[in-house]
Regions:
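Conserved SDR Rossmann-fold cofactor-binding beta-strand/turn motif
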Residues: 138-148
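C-terminal helical subdomain
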Residues: 141, 160-185
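Catalytic loop of short-chain dehydrogenase/reductase
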Residues: 85-134, 146
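Substrate-binding pocket helix/loop in short-chain dehydrogenase/reductase
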Residues: 49-50, 54-62, 161
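A short, exposed helix-loop element centered on a Lys and neighboring polar residues
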Residues: 73-74, 127
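Conserved NAD(P)H cofactor-binding loop of Rossmann-fold oxidoreductase domains
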Residues: 41-46
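The beta1-alpha1 cofactor-binding region of Rossmann-like NAD(H)/NADP(H)-dependent oxidoreductases
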Residues: 11-22, 55, 174
Length: 185
């Protein structure tokens, strides 16, 4: 498929601080210009609840779902270009961060407690970053509902979960991609 764009694949263990923090340096070497889009989507999603959560489950969820996006946001902001000035004097950002949160931040349950706490904090980080980094960087979040059946989830539970949303349906991956595409323009 020929789209007329260059694509570079980078891999890092995001639970490893050195690998995480070196991503932008590796990326800048490859593309030879500032990175203009950051999508914080990497995530750990493991079951626990208030009774079964451990220090390890807490740490893994906080690190992958909050700490890594926070420091990637910092690195992104350091290298993002200044916004363009339009003819009418208004500014237009050339950089965008999109955090993938979860519908659970608005639709709380007693399951996946440490995951939900971390994603809720990522939603807060999104709002703080949007204010702190404007007008240089636009920061948004997408909080999809049930999209893919979890490995451990029964089909009937998955269908029930999709029907429990306000629209009584889940999200499709193509809808999420179209939303991200729109927000990143």
């Amino acid at each position: 498929l020929e789209l007329g764009v260059d694509v570079f694949l980078l891999q890092a263990d995001l639970l490893n601080d050195n690998e995480t923090l070196s991503l932008f340096d590796k990326c800048k070497k490859l593309i030879k210009r500032p990175v203009n889009l950051l999508i914080n989507n990497a995530s750990i999603f493991e079951y626990d609840n208030i009774k079964t959560a451990t220090l390890e489950s807490w740490s893994r969820h906080q690190k992958s779902n909050l700490q890594v996006p926070f420091f990637l946001t910092q690195k992104f902001a350091e290298q993002a270009p200044e916004p363009d000035k339009l003819e009418n004097g208004e500014l237009e950002s050339r950089s965008c961060i999109i955090n993938i949160i979860d519908q659970r931040v608005q639709n709380l349950t007693t399951d996946f407690t440490t995951y939900t706490l971390a994603k809720s904090a990522l939603w807060t980080l999104t709002r703080i970053s949007a204010k702190a980094l404007a007008p240089k960087i636009r920061v948004n979040a997408v909080g999809p509902g049930p999209t893919l059946k979890a490995e451990f989830q029964s089909i009937s539970n998955y269908k029930k979960q999709r029907l429990s949303t306000p629209l009584q349906r889940g999200s499709s991956t193509s809808e999420i991609c179209e939303t991200i595409k729109y927000l990143s323009l």
